[in-house]
Amino acid sequence: MEGTGEMREVGRETLHGGVVQSVSETDEYKEKTIDSEKDGQFRVQPRWRKFLAHVGPGALVAIGFLDPSNLETDMQAGADFKYELLWVILVGMVFALLIQTLAANLGVKTGRHLAELCREEYPHYVNIFLWIIAELAVISDDIPEVLGTAFAFNILLKIPVWAGVILTVFSTLLLLGVQRFGARKLEFIIAAFMFTMAACFFGELSYLRPSAGEVVKGMFVPSLQGKGAAANAIALFGAIITPYNLFLHSALVLSRKTPRSDKSIRAACRYFLIECSLAFIVAFLINVSVVVVAGSICNANNLSPADANTCGDLTLQSTPLLLRNVLGRSSSVVYAVALLASGQSTTISCTFAGQVIMQGFLDMKMKNWVRNLITRVIAIAPSLIVSIVSGPSGAGKLIILSSMILSFELPFALIPLLKFCNSSKKVGPLKESIYTVVIAWILSFALIVVNTYFLVWTYVDWLVHNNLPKYANGLISVVVFALMAAYLVAVVYLTFRKDTVATYVPVPERAQAQVEAGGTPVVDASAADEDQPAPYRKDLADASM
């Protein structure tokens, strides 16, 4: 480690895949990465401590799997189709783990997050298009948070849902303000409430004792029987795999200090994979328990007429019905508090994801409260209109619709991610396994085909059964099919366009750049990377968790 003490902070430092901002001083680096060095003996940091240093990004992403949109789609799937759609959750979670791992790896290997790489690679007009799609994804995901929080206020304060929608503006700003006094403490409280809700569903599950054979069949035997099964499956998939999480995860890993050697980068990728897997397993079990509880109660033979009516139009407002065996009369209060925590925690991740997207695509940043206010006001408009016109039932349908929209927006974040992960111009020799990439591409195109087929089938079915004049149907068809064609053209463009911008910097070139900058030439540039301060993103170091 000789000579490193003379180094000072530099404005821009070369990293695998390009340039990152602000490297901390070497003294600070040594203090945080070395346990002790006495009498010439260097003690290596234990692996468990290295792993704990990487905990956080996957957990924050996994919290999004417990948001109001997931709860709503899980309950609807269970109430309408019992255990038939459990396989969608299994496939969705495996796919989510795969692509979120790719997103984390991309950030670690390149020193940039996905939105920044898109800005550097694509023409300006393409970036504007991708930015708009990404922002729409954030807004689409914020709508369920608005309605979930409004339902929580409705249960706790006995106010109309539309009034709760208006209150969500102030509640979220208050939460962001409180976060300034201790983000980790706030997140711990939110996580405690959410795991309380998870414990309630697990307890209800043990009380109901569903048929293990039926649950296993629903999880491993794909089936889409019955009217609305395809729509529910797409909504389930969209609620699990959200586009903004790809941008968020690739940015969160940059707040950790990762040395620049290939060995250290691969080790960091392994730690992030383990952390993400553990968080996703917990989220998977909770989602399965919600579906099974809803399916067991709403499809029971001894269901009362009142409960049957509730299950026929199950919303977040009527969910306490599913927990009464465990919590009794207190089920409403406990569930409402947990639902409130769920909506608020996901709002925080949405806000930070929005910051990452705006900074990456447009190279601009705004204060968290301003960013949250803009997103929330836009999300409130449809939520308020639907809750006034259609009440709780319409609000529940809007949550399902927003999840379906997320599924259609996913390819515009997913395709650039898959291309960059396997591009030698972006990650050099650190490309992903060919098997991983092939599986990811197959699943991605299967999703695109299913989405397109469902959209065409739904529109044709509506066209056949509506009572509009022929000229009106003709005009609408022209617009709809033009949008479908534009959607497919955009997907094809992103898929087959070759990467042109090289951001990966090989080791010899990095060593030469160091010499040209006035540094000391080294014999083994790769080994020298181990001794240098680990560059990291100070602009992302204040990320939640």
UniProtKB/Swiss-Prot annotation:
GO MF terms, alphabetically ordered: aluminum ion transmembrane transporter activity; metal ion transmembrane transporter activity
GO cellular component, one term: plasma membrane
Knockout-associated phenotype: No visible phenotype under normal growth condition, but after exposure to Al, decreased levels of Al in root-cell sap, increased Al content in the cell wall and increased inhibition of root growth.
Pfam families: Nramp (PF01566)
Region listing for Disordered, in residue ranges: 516-545
Membrane-related topology note: Multi-pass membrane protein
Record's compositionally biased regions (Basic and acidic residues): 536-545
UniProt keyword list: Cell membrane, Ion transport, Membrane, Transmembrane, Transmembrane helix, Transport
Triggers of expression: By Al in roots. Positively regulated by ART1.
Compartments reported by the entry: Cell membrane
GO-annotated biological processes: aluminum cation transport; iron ion transmembrane transport; manganese ion transport; response to aluminum ion
Entry comment describing in which tissues the protein is expressed: Expressed at low levels in roots.
Keyword Membrane listed: yes
Transmembrane parts of this sequence: 51-71, 84-104, 128-148, 155-175, 188-208, 234-254, 278-298, 333-353, 373-395, 398-418, 437-457, 474-494
InterPro entries noted in UniProt: NRAMP_fam
Main localization category: membrane
Cystine residue pairs: none
Family per similarity comment: Belongs to the NRAMP (TC 2.A.55) family.
Function text: Metal transporter that transports the trivalent cation aluminum (Al(3+)), but does not seem to transport divalent cations such as iron (Fe(2+)), manganese (Mg(2+)) or Cadmium (Cd(2+)). Involved in Al tolerance by taking up Al in root cells, where it is detoxified by chelation with organic acid anions and sequestration into the vacuoles.
UniProt-listed NCBIfam families: nramp (TIGR01197), Nramp_1 (NF037982)
HAMAP family per the UniProt record, alphabetical: NRAMP
Name of protein: Metal transporter NRAT1
Organism: Oryza sativa subsp. japonica
